[in-house]
Structure formats: C-alpha cells, structure tokens
Amino acid sequence: MDTPDKNRISAVSFCNFEDSPVFQYINDLSPIEPVKPGRPENILHSLVFTSPSSSSSLFCSPQLNSYRDSRFFIKRHRSLDLSSPVVLIGETLKNSPDALWEEKLKCRPEKLENVSEPKPFKEQISLAIELANSLKHGRDGCDIQMVSCDEVPMDADDEIGSGGGSRELSDELCRQSFDPLDFDADSDGVLHTDEMEAESGFGKEVIMFDVADIQNYEQQIPRTTDPRFYSLASEPQQFSIYCNNSNYVEEREGSCSVQVAAGAPDINLSCSSKVAAIDSTAEAEDKEDKDLQPSGKQRSVRRRCLTFDMGGSHKRIPLRDSTNDLPLDSTSINKAPSPQNCLDTSKQDTDEILPIPRTIGLHLNGFVNPSVSSGRKKKKIKDGQAFPSTTFHYNIEDEFSTPVSTKRDLVVFSDVKIMEPPERSVEGECFDQLMAMENRQLSQGLDELGSCKRCKCRKSQCLKLYCECFSAGLFCGEPCSCQNCFNKPIHEDLVMKSREVIKARNPLAFAPKVVSTSDTVIDLWVENSKTPASARHKRGCNCRKSGCSKKYCECFMMGVGCSSNCRCMGCKNTFGHTNEQCAGDSDVVTINDEAKHYGDHGDASRQNEEILTSERNRLLLPGSVAFRSLTSLSNLSEL
C-alpha cells in the first residue's frame, strides 16, 4: 500500500469544505455594504483638527455610527434670521458637560437630509483640508461667513431647549452690539432687519466642536465686510451698550453714542460726548436743579469722577450725592467766595469749576474743605445782624484756636472790639513788697538763676536737702528729670510740712551760704578781685572740678571770694582765693567764730535774733530765698 500524495489530499479537503452546506449558507447571506452618499456642498462637519482626541472621536470606522459616540449634535434655531449662511464661533454651552463650542450653520432644506449619514474617512479629511485652504487664501469655497458669537445674543440655546421660555443675557453682549440705527430690537433680544426677514425662512444647523480646535482658527477667520456687522475693537470710537428689555435714551454728539440702562453700574467715561443716564431718581433731582444747569436738558450723570480739575476737559458736571447735597437756597448760591477759590482766577476763565462734594471717597478726593468747615463753626456776634444773602458768625475763641491756614477765612468787623484776657493777679504780702525790686533785678538775676542745676532725684521724691530745687526753695519744673516728684505746687502743703520738719532740726538748713550784714543793697555783680567786706560765709563751697570759676559755685555766684571754711579744691575764684585774704578779712566771720561768740554768752535767744536780723537784710539780694520764691511765683502766674 503506497503513501497518498499530500497535495492531492489538501486539494480534496479544500474542495470538500467549499462544497459544504454551511459554507454555502454563509455565502447566501447578504453582505453589509457601506453606503456612499453624495457629497454635500454647504455642510461643514469639522475643521482641521490638531488634537488627537477630537480626531479619534470624529473620524471613526464607517461601519459604526460616528454621530452616536461623537460630541456633535444638530439643533433647530428659529429665533435668528440672517441673510446668508453664518458660522457663529466663540461661546460655550452652559448645559454641555464637555464645555464644547457652538457652530451655527445655515443650509438649504434639501441638503439636511444627508446630515446624519456617515461619510468615509478620506472624504472627511479632504473636506476639512479644502475648507482650511479656502479660509486661508480668502476664497469663498463653501459660502460660509464666520461671525463671533459675542455679536449674537446667547439666549438662542435656551430658546431651543425650552421653547423660548427662558431668556438669559450674556455678559459678552454688553461689550459688542449692533448699531441701533440699522437694527431693530425685538422682545427676544435678537437683532434683525426687514431685508434679513425677507431672505430668511430656512432652518439652522448647530454643530458642536472642541474649544482647542476653534482657537487655532480665530486669527484665520476672515472678518466680514458687511456694514451691518462691526466690532468694537475695530472701531473703538463708535460703540453702544445694548441691554435686553430695557428702555434706553440715546444722545449723539460727534462720533460717540453711549446708552446706559436703568440699574446698570456707574461707568467712568473719558470721551467728550454727552452721556444720558435713565434713572427715576436722577430725573427727579434734575428737575430741582433746572436753574443751576448751564443747558436746558433735564438729564444728569450719576458717576464718580476721579479727576475734578483735569486740564483740557469740558465743562464740569456737578457731582450729586443725595446724602451730601447742600440745600439749594440763596445761602448756598450766594455764599461768599473763600480765599481758596480766589487764589487762581485763570482757571475760571476757561473752565467752570464747581465745588467738590464734601465726602471722603476712595481716592482722597472728598476731604473736607477747611475754609467751608471753619465758616460753619463761627458763632454769631450780634443778634439780628444779617447780611443780604447769608450771615457770618465770628467767635473770639476761634481766632486763637484756629490754625494759621484758616485764620484768613475769619471775618472781623470794625465795630467789634476784641478785648484781651486780663492778666492774672497774684496776691501775697511778700509779692507786693518785693514787686518793685523784682522789676529792677529780675533781668540781672535771670541768667544766673537759669544756669543753676536742676534736680535728678529718683528716690527722695524731691523732699530732701540734696534736691537742688527743694533746698533752694523752688518747685520742680520742666527742666527737672526727677521721678515721683512731690515738690510741685499741687503738693504745696506737703512741701511746707517737710521744710518745717527740717528747720526744726537745723534752723540754718535753708539759709544761703553767703549772707550780707549791711543794711544797704550793694551791687555784687561789679567785678572785684577782693571779697566784699559786707559778706560773710556761713558754710562755704565744696567745688572739686570747676575751680570755683563757674556759676554753680555759691561763692562765685554771689560775687564773694572763697574763705577758709570752703572745702573747694583748685580754687580759681576771681573774687578771692583761700590764701589771698586781704585787709577786709577781719570783716569776714566764719561759723566757728559765731559759735564761739554764741558759746561765750550762752544765750540762744540772742542767737536767734541775730539770725533773723541777717535774714531780713538779705531779702533784697539776688539768689536769696525770698528772691527765688518771688521768681517761682512769677513762673506760676505764667502757667
């Protein structure tokens, strides 16, 4: 038995497979053939897409329904009638989850039957390339005009879905709109003309596609030359603000036309045209200000101007504020001009400068005018004294409390006599007795008294003898840098008690270190190289570094030389040193000599009498306690 041929076996088996009834049944089934529809002329399915995600969703297999999974859909829009096919690009559907952009296309009715049929992949690519080339080279290949969606009301989508029940006004509509002279506004907020209505009557196709695909062609889209469509960016001087379902009034002057609807926010405008604002409150206020307006029109501008006195501007319009308006009476109209308004009269020749509202605004343009505020605070001088249109009030206290810049605004009448406040009288027997002496010697002793040291007490409360002010019989003043001080006029009782306690222990505690024994007043400021015979030392000085040549040395200040009782070091007193005692030294008596004299007699009463006599004789000398107390009283009177 031979081996069968392999080729023969395979051929026989293949023939048997084709002749099988199963294979014949499969062949008898009708094949699925792709439908090749005719190419439409005016239907745009897509542009040249650059993103792979969008191209994969659009150009899918011909056997599948591309419109089922695609993000394209068709809408009917009957509210907009245009004379030619227009593609509207640039607005986002609010209800779409993919945030797609909208394209509105006008086509013939006979061309819409093939919209839902899929097209081959190659034809879709060729159509997109042809459309891109036609748009790039400016050819009108598919009879399509590109218009931004900003120029069309965005309530079209809502009308399609809800049957025209809901209406929304887009913010983009306030930026660009049509000329109200060429177009009419219907109740739905759609702009159209009679010519456009005659040519209309066809449905519109709405196709959605991605934002990224549209932005690539925003600069390639040719701008229309139709005079009915124009952009605000191309003609910035010609614009209008259109608002849906609002009555508006328009005024034209030059090439500027502005419309402001009721309830719209205030807008700062820099153009020179007149602006009309429709507001019931504004019109009511304008009727009251009819006599004040330079023109006969009963309109005003409710806005905030940040530049009141800008050069080259036209007439200022008075800014109104219901809370800050002054009453329109003869007082406010015939008010006397303030010096601030009279400083520069050259500006009033060209521009009419109106008063700035008395409000404090955001840009510091409403500060209170000092001249006006100062006039309101003036008080009336005489009852019934009036002037033709207003009454000026004046108060003497305002003259002293008003700053220098506002004193010129005060009005002073010739019949008013301004009395100066009377001088304060100081009572006291000691002050009355020494008043004549003070006037003569005050000028001589001020320099010496002003040069004395001031206290710097910290813990003594300025009630001890080592406080310079307390020991000199003076109160602490401003030059002192003491802390917790009680040596002040308000604590006078406490100061006097402290002095009495110290005098009880040492009667000579507050006595000057140099006293005069003569009954006549001797000029001690005459330069003399010798110690006067009429002076005697009680304690002496304790100078260390000054050399007794400065005025805080007691001996040098009183014009006497230092004695043996002085404990100074390096004495250079020009009135006499310790070793330069002259013939007049016999007249100088030290405390030790007085102690010996009092000790010999042993009479304490005589000692007190002599001390009192010496105190009476030194009352008229500068630097004494009485003289210093007199100076302190004069200082208190000035306070």
Swiss-Prot record:
Entry keywords, A to Z:
Developmental protein, Metal-binding, Nucleus, Zinc
What are the GO cellular component annotations?
A: nucleus
* Disulfide linkage: none
Localization per record: Nucleus
InterPro entries in the record, alphabetically? Answer: CRC (IPR005172), Tesmin/TSO1-like_CXC (IPR033467), TSO1-like (IPR044522)
Q: Tell me which Gene Ontology terms the entry assigns under biological process.
A: regulation of DNA-templated transcription
> Key word Cell inner membrane present in the record?
no
What ranges does the record give for the region Disordered, renumbered to this chain?
282-301, 313-347
Q: Where is the composition biased (Polar residues)?
A: 329-345
- Show the Pfam families listed in the entry: TCR
UniProt signal peptide: none
Which stretches make up the CRC domain?
451-576
Cite the GO molecular-function annotations of the record.
DNA-binding transcription factor activity; metal ion binding
Which PROSITE patterns does this UniProt record tie to the protein? CRC
Domain notes, please? The cysteine-rich domain CRC binds zinc in vitro.
Function description: Plays a role in development of both male and female reproductive tissues.
The family assignment reads:
Belongs to the lin-54 family.
Please give the name of this protein.
Protein tesmin/TSO1-like CXC 4
Provenance organism? Arabidopsis thaliana
Gene transcribed to yield this protein: TCX4
